[in-house]
Amino acid sequence: MMTMKEIMSQKTFAVLGNTLDETKYAYKIKQGLLEHGYTVYAVGKELNSLNEIEEEIDIIDLCIHPVKGIKLLKECEKNFKCIVIQPGAESEEIIQYLQENNIPYIEGCLLIGLREYAENN
């Protein structure tokens, strides 16, 4: 399992959630990552699937309703290093799926990770 510090040392993030609504955390996380020089892909409102991303993904950030999140994760054919589950995006089904498939994850907030560990890449 990666620590938040290790996660923030990665380069490419996929944010799952409503990244077009300025009032939503997914939007704030996407903007924060971009401002710190990370490569960011937005899935949910901008892209429909993680599989649409041609580049390799380091981190997937779940900032989306758990029902939509589990669907996107199950459809994902891409390799990645870790998933960050934002508060409110977790469910027993997601945790069980990740554990059964040996997918590394942490529960946490990338906004806090940005504040504590991000350096301009």
Describe each PLM feature range:
Residues 79-98:
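ADP-ribose/adenylate-binding Rossmann-like module
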Residues 9-10, 55-59, 79:
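Alpha-helix C-terminal capping/helix-to-coil transition sites in glycosyltransferase folds
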